Design a protein with these regions (language model features):
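Substrate-binding groove of N-acetylhexosamine-processing glycoside hydrolases
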Residues: 27, 77-80, 129-137, 141, ...
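Aromatic-lined carbohydrate-binding surfaces of glycoside hydrolases
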Residues: 10-228, 258-271
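N-terminal carbohydrate-binding accessory modules
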Residues: 1-8
């Protein structure tokens, strides 16, 4: 299968708002991405970018956040490494929805569409466009030689709700869709006037339900290129029937977006690779049937989300998803086959251990001595998932429910014969958890900043440690009782 049939761009999306890797990780990863068939990066910095001047509070230059983002020198290094590897960079900066990283700050709280929610910016506030253009100006000026800019604009959860927007929508021929399109047009016109060489990409989801006439009358096709995103596997893949005819009549240039991670669960730890492969196979079919309708299909972004929003917990860490990314790129170029699977497996170091694309029953054997950057973290996460299964099996066991439930403990109505066997189980789990934490901390320090490691440990390991310690102490206290009711 000739990949060039479906556009010349194959962009790997790096969502840096969750677990941004250190620069040395990119030095190892970027050459591989080029080898696997990627042509560029869709770089979503969010709050890890070193914004300055009036925007200093939202980025990595603010003192309290220095450890979780990039310095100017590090950000430049990332761009340099990408360039050296022949990877074009397309920066992505949110300009409408998913604005939590800006609107959470007191300085810009007044720009929220709904005062208590920091997600969406108000398109009617006179200070909104100056803020958005300031974000764009700093991003564009930092990225030399870019040809495209992605301005996000997806999932605008709150639109047309403030008093001014409500009146504007009521007075408009097309209501809320006009509010959305007018904001995008204002941004796009600023970019065209200031950076006439830049082509502008937007996520397409807010456009899907809009009538052809609305899109046509706003001349949106003159200014932006939609990136159609759909991340589900074949069984749940569904785009509107009219999307290709409608978009091709409005937009001369169209993109697609698949997913290699961050799309099968908001707190997923390891990608369900089968689902991601299926997503890419279905996209290939979708494009095969419809791409001839499009004047020019630009290419595809392989998205890898790190958080579902700014406040969400981290989902799959990038090293755990490298096998999924490698296979999805291969599938995009050649289709899925046993031969493709084996080629990718061998290149990643799955020699003595099978390369599973279907989730395994846990606990499961863990591979070792793999060949991709960060494999040590990836197998550490496998260990964590194995451990979590053992932990849940223990704390939800019949033995605890039958002989040490809260009522029994509160009333000192426990059987010491049954409790004695629990102490070794809790002790063993705590010892293994300590080993797991030690291993993961060492391996993560090679790739991640301390702030991220602390968050991951605090989210995933600390609650289990607290619960096990509490259960062990409760058991010991019950065993010390000399009399029982």
């Amino acid at each position: 299968m000739d990949a060039l049939t479906f556009g010349s761009h194959r962009l790997v999306h790096l969502d840096l708002k969750g677990a941004p890797p250190r620069v040395n990780y990119f030095e190892k990863l970027f050459p591989l991405l080029r080898t696997w068939g990627a042509t560029g990066l869709l770089l979503e910095w969010e709050d890890t970018f070193p914004y300055n001047r009036e925007l200093t509070p939202i980025g990595s230059n603010r003192p309290i956040n220095l450890a979780s983002g990039y310095t100017v020198q590090e950000a430049r290094q990332i761009l340099q490494i990408a360039g050296d590897c022949g990877l074009a960079v397309i920066p992505l900066v949110q300009t409408f929805g998913h604005m939590e990283f800006v609107l959470k700050h007191d300085e810009w709280r007044s720009l929220r569409e709904v005062e208590r929610f920091p997600s969406s910016i108000c398109p009617s506030n006179p200070q909104t466009l100056p803020l958005v253009t300031s974000l764009i100006r700093q991003i564009v000026n930092f990225h030399p030689d870019i040809q495209y800019l992605h301005i996000g604009a997806d999932e605008v959860w709150h639109l047309g709700l403030c008093s001014v927007c409500t009146k504007r929508a009521a007075a408009s021929k097309y209501g809320k869709p006009s509010l959305y399109l007018e904001h995008i047009l204002a941004i796009a016109q600023y970019i065209q006037e200031t950076y006439p060489y830049l082509k502008i990409i937007v996520w397409d989801d807010m456009l899907r339900s809009m009538d052809f006439q609305v899109l046509k009358e706003h001349y949106i096709g003159k200014y932006v290129e939609p990136m159609i995103w759909h991340y589900n596997s074949r069984d749940n893949f569904s785009l509107p029937q009219d999307i290709w005819d409608k978009y091709s009549a409005v937009f001369p240039h169209i993109w697609a977006a698949t997913a290699f991670k961050g799309a099968t669960g908001s707190c997923q730890h390891i990608p369900i690779i089968r689902n991601h492969v299926s997503n890419h196979e279905k996209w290939l079919e979708e494009l095969g049937a419809n791409v001839n309708k499009v004047h020019e299909f630009r290419g595809t972004a392989f998205t890898g989300w790190s958080r579902y929003d700014h406040y969400a917990t981290m989902c799959e860490l990038l090293p755990t998803a490298i096998p999924s990314l490698a296979l999805c790129l291969k599938v995009w170029l050649h289709g899925y086959s046993e031969q493709t699977h084996m080629q990718v497996a061998n290149s990643l170091g799955y020699i003595d251990h099978p390369f599973h694309i279907i989730p395994q029953l846990r606990p499961a054997p863990i591979p070792n001595n793999l060949l991709f950057p960060g494999w040590q973290v990836a197998v550490g996460i496998e260990w964590f998932i194995n451990f979590r299964t053992k932990y849940h099996n223990t704390i939800t066991s019949e033995q605890i429910s039958t002989w040490m439930n809260p009522w029994q403990v509160a009333n000192n109505n426990t059987n010491p014969m049954q409790l004695e066997s629990l102490i070794p189980a809790f002790t063993d789990l705590l010892l293994e958890l300590s080993s797991l934490e030690g291993y993961l901390r060492v391996q993560m320090e090679n790739i991640y900043f301390p702030y991220m490691i602390d968050e991951w440990m605090g989210t995933n390991l600390q609650p289990m440690k607290v619960k096990l310690t509490e259960l062990k102490e409760t058991t010991e206290n019950q065993l010390k009782l000399s009399t029982r009711v």
